[in-house]
Regions:
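ATP-dependent NMP and nucleoside kinases share a basic, alpha-helical "lid"
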Residues: 60-69, 83-140, 184
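N-terminal phosphate/diphosphate-binding loop that engages ATP/GTP or pyrophosphate donors
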Residues: 18, 22-69
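Short aromatic/basic micro-patch
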Residues: 54-56, 82, 101, 167
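Short, well-ordered alpha-helical microsegments
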Residues: 17, 106-108, 176-177
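Phosphate-binding P-loop
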Residues: 1-4
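Short hydrophobic/aromatic beta-strand immediately N-terminal to the Walker A/P-loop
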Residues: 6-10
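Conserved glycine(s) of the Walker
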Residues: 11, 16
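NTP-dependent small-molecule kinase module
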Residues: 138-142, 156-198
Length: 198
């Protein structure tokens, strides 16, 4: 069985990563599976454990980190976020294309460890910083000081976009998700052709 792709989607907080991912996942021909991150933060109202994130205590998270059980992990706004290593490898070995939706710091770590034609990195950017602020405030899930911290970090993170294979502007949900689907299909086809040549 052919090993699946690893697709890394990053972008600043509030850019719409989750919304775009959900739209991309509607295309079953891509054989995508979402890699669920582990976090110590509290769930938002609509989030479910084991679906949106694996929610754990800080003690549990730090124990797993000490045992090198994460492909990557990072600390952001008082909480830890990480990608369980064994979970991702199991899915890829089953031939599934694993989709990571992670913060930039975590993506840097993953991309330093995972290289090759079966890894795709995509950076999602907002059409403007003003639009990004509107989206974050529209969540109504965080106090103003956290929003300001997220916006300041977003400005720094956007400067990192050129380190990714692709940059996609999320100015329109359909257009952004279509572009990401094209990127994935192109890489799948390229790897199929390389396999046929062997």
């Amino acid at each position: 069985m052919k090993k699946g792709l690893l697709i890394v989607l990053s972008g600043p907080s509030g850019v719409g990563k989750g919304t775009v991912r959900k739209k991309v996942f509607k295309d079953e021909s891509l054989n995508l599976v979402y890699s669920i991150s582990m976090t110590t933060r509290l769930p938002r109202n609509s989030e479910k454990d084991g679906v949106d994130y694996f929610f754990v205590s800080t003690d549990k998270f730090l124990q797993l980190a000490k045992e090198d059980k994460f492909l990557e992990f990072t600390h952001f706004v008082g909480n830890y976020y990480g990608t369980p290593r064994e979970y991702v490898e199991k899915l890829r070995n089953e031939g599934k294309n694993v989709f990571l939706e992670i913060e930039i710091e975590g993506a840097k770590e993953v991309l330093s460890k995972c290289k090759g034609k079966d890894v795709i990195s995509i950076f999602l950017v907002p059409p403007s910083l003003e639009e990004l602020e509107r989206r974050i405030r529209g969540r109504k899930s965080e106090p103003d000081n956290i929003i300001q911290e997220r916006l300041a970090k977003a400005q720094r993170e956007i400067g990192y976009k050129d380190n990714y294979d692709y940059v996609v502007v999320n100015d329109n949900l359909s257009r952004a998700s279509y572009r990401i689907k094209q990127i994935i299909r192109k890489r799948m086809k390229m790897l199929e052709m390389a396999d046929e040549e062997r």
